[in-house]
Structure formats: C-alpha cells, structure tokens
Amino acid sequence: MSDLVKVTLPDGSQKEAPRGTPVIDFVKGQIGPGLAKAAYFARLDGEPVDLSRAIERDARLEIVTTRSPEALEVARHDAAHVMASVVQKLYPGTQVTIGPAIEDGFYYDFARETPFTPEDLERIEKATNEAIKADLPFVRSEISMEAALALFEGMGERYKVEIVKDIAAKGAKTLTLYKHGDWVDFCLGPHGPSTGRIGVVKLLNVAGAYWRGDAKNAMLQRIYGTAFFDKKELDAHLAKLEEVKKRDHRRLGPQLGLFTFHEFAPGAPFWLPAGTVLYNVLEDAMRRLVLKNGYQEVKTPLLFNKRLWETSGHWGKYRENMFLVVDSESDPALPLEDRCSFSLKPMNCPSHHLIYRMDKRSYRELPVRYFTTDALHRNEASGSLGGLTRVRQFEQDDAHIYLREEQVTDEVLRIFELMKVVYGAFGLGFEATFSTRPEQRIGDDALWDRAEALLRKSLDATGLKWTLNAGDGAFYGPKIDMLVTDSLGRKWQTCTIQLDYAAPERFDLTFVGEDNKEHRPVVIHRAIYGSFERFVAILVEHYAGAFPAWLAPVQARVVTVSDRFEAWAREAGEALQARGWRVEVDASSDKLGAKIRNAQLAKIPFTLVVGEKEVEAKGVSPRRHGGEDLKTMPLEAFAELMTREATAPF
C-alpha cells in the first residue's frame, strides 16, 4: 500500500498527500492559508467530516467555508453543545437530552424541575458567548456502545442512557463523541474546529416540549437560540424576527376582525365578517379559475361509514387522525344493520372515487376533474394546534383528476400553469420538492416504482429545479410539494400534486379504452392553495394585513371632513357599492385626521376624503394605504381606478 493518497478537488485537479494527513493540514499545505482560515468543515467522498479528520484513502475533497449556509448550520449545532455545557455548569443537576440545529437556529431540551426565567436566559446567553471566546477545540472520538452506556450511566444522564440503548438495539457497535473542555456529548457530527469559530449567539425563548414528542412522557424545557458568524447578520436576523412578530397572523387576524378561536371548539376558527369576505374572495377566485379550466365542482357528505375508509386504506393508516362520531358496532341493543361506525371525512378523495364509479367511463371523457371546497376534519393533537397554520377543521381547494397514464405529464404541466397564475397574483415565489414512498404505505414496490418514475418525469418536464424529500410521500403515492416564499423570505408548504395508482385498484375504478376493454385510470390528487386556513395565515403575514385592493375585505372607506358633507359621502359610497366594490362610509363626529388614521390602522387600500371641493366636483380625494395622496378626481374616474386595481387577477 502506497504511503500517498490522491485527493481530487472540486475542479477535477488532483494532489497527493501522505496517508493520514488531517484535512486542515492538507488544505494549509496544498491549497493555501486563505481557504484554511475560511474552512469550517469538509466532505470526503460526499461525507461531512471535521477538518481534523485524517485522509486515509484516495478521495474527493470539498471544503465548506463560513460563506456557506451549511457551515452556519454546523456552527449552530456547535452553539447548542456550548449552551448545554453552560446550562449544566450554571444549574447543576440539569439533565440534557437532545440539541439539534434547526432552520435559522438551534435548540436544546433540558430536564429541570425549576423553570428557566428570562433572567436565567440572559445569564445563559452571556456565559455561552464567554465560553465561545475561550476557543476550546471540538475533539471527536469513537467508543464502544458498552463504554458509552457506562459513561453516561456514570454521569447520571438518564435521557442519554435511553438514547444509547435505542441506538445499540438497532445494531450499532460504536458511538461518536464530541468533547469541548470537560463537557461531552454524542452526535454524528461534523463540528467546527473550535468554539471560537462559532461567532455570536443569541438565545430567543424557552418553551415546553415533551420528551420524544409524546405527551405521555416528561415535559422538558426547550431553549431556542440562534448563531451567526457576524454580529451584523445577527442584528439583521433579529430585526426580521421583530417584523415576523408584528406580522403574526395570530395577532393581526383578531385585530383586523378576520377570525378568532374559542375554547369550546379548539382548532376550529370562527370566521368574522371581514374574514368571511376574505375567505369568500379567495374561494370565488379559485372557483372561477378551475371551472374555466375543465374542472367540475362537486360536494359530498361530511360523515361516512367506516367501510369507506377501510376500502380507501385510511382506516388502517390514518385512523388516529380521524374523528370517530358514531361507534355502535358492539352495541347489542341495536339491530345488526344499525351497528356501525361513522367518522367525519379527513380527506375528499374517497368520496370523489365513489362519484367517478357511478358511471361507466370512456377514454374519450378523460381527464375527469372533480373540484370541491368541502370542510374536512383531522384530529390533530391539541399541543400541535397553532393559529390557522395547524387546525382541526379546514377546507381545501381540493381536486381529483382521473386520467390515462399517458396523460399524466400534460396534466401536471396544466396544474403548474394554474399554480403560476395563482402564486404570481400574490407575489409569492415558489420551489418544488419531490417526495417518495414512506415506510407506511399501500401498494407493492413495482407500483411505487412506476408511480415515482412517472411523477419524476412530469416534474422534470416543468423545467423547475426541485429537491428530493425521500420517504415523505403520501401512503398511497408519491407527491410534488410546492414551497412558496413570502415577502420575508420564509418558505411555506402549500400546493401538492400526488399520483395514485392504488385507489383505482381499491375502488375498482375503470374506463373503457380504444380497444373496447376496461382499464384502470390513474388518479392525481391536487390542491393549489392547500388549506384555505393556512393560506390565509400566509397571506396575512406576507402582506402584514395590508391586502391588495382586490383581496381586501373593505376596499375603500369614504371619510367626511365634517357632517355637512355626509349626503355626498353616502351617495358616493352607495354608487361604488352598486358597482360591486366593498365600500364603507365613516361620517362619524371624529376629526378628519382621526378618521384617516383609523382607516390606515384598518389597512384599507383606499381612504376617500369628501369635503367641499369634492362635493362641488362630484368626486373624491383618494389616499392609498401607506400615505400616498392622489389628486381629487370625479367619482367615475375613481371607479375606473378600482376596475384597474381591485379586479381579481384570476
């Protein structure tokens, strides 16, 4: 065996180094000190490794620097380790559990009887940043599972012991440890070279979290934080978080009179008058769009016998998320025909399959596209409910398309065109993910192979860049999920396109082909908004409650300079209402400045001032939300402006 190894760099060039050379030494000696200084971790043949890892074989080497988001993710995991070590030093007896990097930050879960206070958080943050400055190296080692178990048992870390036992039960023989100073934890890594490379840490808040996400387990304390290499970047991020708080739909929704919740109906929103207008505008726009694109609207029952869900597979795979309304199967007092179970539907697809099956179908009819906005109910855990983004009762712009296999790619392209129209109207960017077969699924592997290959081909045909989300498909088929990007750069999952070969088999769905024989159709499940509730939450935060004129619950408010001008104000308001615009009149005794301010606070797109000159001109003086004053114009001219700016774009 040669004492030298060949290292292939990203540009294809090759260099030689003594076997066993640490990555960081290779970079310093063979590439240059600049890259070595910027390096945070590396990849050897695609595997993320520490910079201290020895190069033992010929390999491809990629250096990940602090300019990469991936390096920041590793640094945040480093920060979680440092924070945990500080917590155990400041609060002896605290048990550590898990502490991963997450989007935009990190957290660590602690078992401690006394709750952490805001003052504790400040103390921990200060000590964490001091520990970072100590610039202690992260040292990696591997030990046997037996030694790991003895180590953490000796430390009294019962949660770590539980995890070690689980890892051992899966067949692992060794465990990777990382140590900085005298504090040690296990994880896969990689980590940065030392604590001093992390940058600056800010702790954000403390929340409760059940051990392993199970409400039957102990309640832990989760400390959230974030880290950045540069304080300016941290400050910008904190400013963004403040803006996120201001835009929180849970705050703005009730403030703007859109929706509220009540303890008597957890997870089910009450849509207030303004919110109902917004909801209906969204629903009507989508209905117009799909009906002119070959869809047929249907409505089906909310309550179904469990036999439907047994046929669809939901009873076996999804029952814990369903609301069982009637359960009388074992009631001896009832006649046999009345002994049954009923549940509220969590999905529309099975009922649409029943409609498709009611008639004999020809290949000439396909695709058949059913659309609905029926209410759905899913039994989400109470702890997971949060505003409109996670609810128990909701509606979707739900559609199911029955078609021949060779029509799938064209149909996916049609759906993408609809999606671009919708997201473009709201100024939302988007990207795609492709989700493949999950562990819990129906249908054999051959069917899944076929479905995944076809949907991947269809996704490629759109020309969009996409990422793979392995194992996250629906239990009946692979799917494309769309992530929209809002005005704050946050990503939200909305549109889904799911390909289903299993339902036609389970429901015996057929069509008569050109050969006059029966064939199975393929089913596409698709939604563009996703749930209306979640989409409204996205829009509230995207627009900070200041909706565009076509979407706003109130599009214009007429305000009077004084009560002398009330007659024309009401006449103007009624004339605009007669044209279909959503207009209010404020002829209260408040001063004009207060009326304008109230309209601005209500985020109404246009405030129409009416005083003496407006009465004389039979017009209005519009002011846009945000303060731009338009010149006085005849009422007809403003109506034309509304036609241009307040007509639904789809």
From Swiss-Prot:
UniProt-listed Pfam families: HGTP_anticodon, TGS, tRNA-synt_2b, tRNA_SAD
EC number(s) reported in the record: 6.1.1.3
PROSITE patterns: AA_TRNA_LIGASE_II, TGS
Gene Ontology CC entries for this record: cytoplasm
Catalytic activities: tRNA(Thr) + L-threonine + ATP = L-threonyl-tRNA(Thr) + AMP + diphosphate + H(+)
Recorded GO MF terms: ATP binding; metal ion binding; threonine-tRNA ligase activity; tRNA binding
Cofactor comment: Binds 1 zinc ion per subunit.
Key word RNA-binding present: yes
Cofactor(s) listed: Zn(2+)
Keywords: Aminoacyl-tRNA synthetase, ATP-binding, Cytoplasm, Ligase, Metal-binding, Nucleotide-binding, Protein biosynthesis, RNA-binding, tRNA-binding, Zinc
GO BP terms: threonyl-tRNA aminoacylation
Binding site for Zn(2+): C349, H400, H525
Ranges where the TGS domain occurs: 3-65
CDD domains in UniProt: TGS_ThrRS (cd01667), ThrRS_anticodon (cd00860), ThrRS_core (cd00771)
SMART domains in alphabetical order: tRNA_SAD
Tree of life domain: Bacteria
Stretches the record annotates as Catalytic: 248-548
Cystine residue pairs: none
Subcellular location: Cytoplasm
Its job: Catalyzes the attachment of threonine to tRNA(Thr) in a two-step reaction: L-threonine is first activated by ATP to form Thr-AMP and then transferred to the acceptor end of tRNA(Thr). Also edits incorrectly charged L-seryl-tRNA(Thr).
The family this protein is said to belong to: Belongs to the class-II aminoacyl-tRNA synthetase family.
HAMAP family reported in the protein's UniProt record: Thr_tRNA_synth
Assembly description: Homodimer.
Protein name: Threonine--tRNA ligase
Organism lineage string: Bacteria, Pseudomonadati, Myxococcota, Myxococcia, Myxococcales
